[in-house]
Amino acid sequence: MAGQMSKFRRPEQLDLLPYIAKWLALAGLVALLAGSASALFLLSLDHATQWRETHPWVIWLLPVAGFAVGLAYHLIGKPVDAGNNLIIDEIHDPKKIVPLRMVPMVLIGTVVSHLFGASVGREGTAVQMGGALADQLTHVFRLRREDRRVILMAGISAGFASVFGTPLAGALFGLEVLAIGRMRYDALFPCVVAAIVADQVGQAWGVVHTHYVIGEVVPVQLWSVMAVVAAGIVFGLTGLLFATATHKLGAFVKRLITYSPLRPFAGGLLIAVAVWALGSNHYIDVDKYIGLGIPSIVQSFQMPMAPWDWLGKMVFTVVSLGTGFKGGEVTPLFYIGATLGNALAPLLHLPFGMLAGIGFVAVFAGAANTPLATIVMAMELFGPEIAPLAAIACIASYLVSGHTGIYHAQRVGHSKHHRPLPEEIRLSDIKQFHAQSESASERKVTLAGEEK
């Protein structure tokens, strides 16, 4: 009898139905919230950018705007000041619900930063809004610890997908950004649903994403592969430089200026003076280095550009983010990668549009440690033809950038290289770990010498 019953055991696929129904509903709700928030943000950003471009004198108010944003965070925003790192930390080690105030504060702070001329991006804002809004559902539905982790990841995916119009890359980003070398497949279905629906919600609100055309893509041959590997190494080192410079400047400014609202005030003053000083230079169009810089990114696919444009954007972005202006790192990284690829193309005998497109994603891959998301992003933005060469560059960039990144809270799930690192160590703790290891090695050598 028992043998007969085993023959009629319920198929395990039926057990998926409650799971699918649950996460279709939850991820769909996350997507509705995150997609709507991203739409409001992007439409506001468009208006802010248009107004700033027609009123160039407003750059002189950037220090005042920076002080205002810094003061708001100083008075009521300290619990959410960590931004993306707070979301990542809560996924790894859930403690308390992300405060809802993160949403209006980062939205207004980023729009104000763009309105007055800071060089910041938009991904960080969308991810923070998506994560914070998703986490409010933890209260509403009394989600368990593991479900809370998954819904936060879905919020990240929804925010990323809706702000860039790349649903598949957004889904992978939410899975991949948490830890180097490891992904959580238990969140794959919710992240994919949230990303796809959030992108559609944004479009339903009237959001139109930039369309990029890269032109000719060379065939995959030995010479093109070698050239792209070389470019990928440069892209990875550039991502490393960006992340390191931003973190080091931020730490230096915190030591130098103890009152936090004065940090973006000082940064805004420095940027305004630099724009004024360089504005009379006939060789440098400094206006390209403030704001998002989307027109320059589009131009990098169409014609040769000044070989120093990537460096100019990096300097203005590092100063903006390092002194406390709100916004993301990713769009500036797109700009840096695209213009650097444009500059490298003649040296490597590759079409500048193609290498600009590869640089667009590869610098981001190295700086964020998300090679899979960026490979898929290349296909979503530029077409499938670029996939093989983009994959080579993104992987090279990811490996060369080492265990650094723009997200301090990112963990090491699996080391990139053979040099051992403790599992789950935060990127911000690696330097201290190496210092302790070297100190322990020196003590061993000293003790061995004394014993002899």
Curated annotation (Swiss-Prot):
Induction: By fluoride, via a fluoride-responsive riboswitch.
GO MF annotation list: chloride channel activity
Localization (cell): Cell membrane
One Pfam family matching this protein: Voltage_CLC
Residues spanning the signal sequence: none
Gene3D superfamilies the record matches: Clc chloride channel
TM stretches of this protein: 23-43, 57-77, 97-117, 160-180, 188-208, 222-242, 264-284, 315-337, 344-364, 386-408
PANTHER family: CHLORIDE CHANNEL PROTEIN CLC-E, CHLORIDE TRANSPORTER
Function noted in UniProt: Transports chloride and fluoride with similar efficiency.
Name of the featured protein: Chloride/fluoride channel protein
Organism encoding this protein: Pseudomonas syringae pv. tomato (strain ATCC BAA-871 / DC3000)
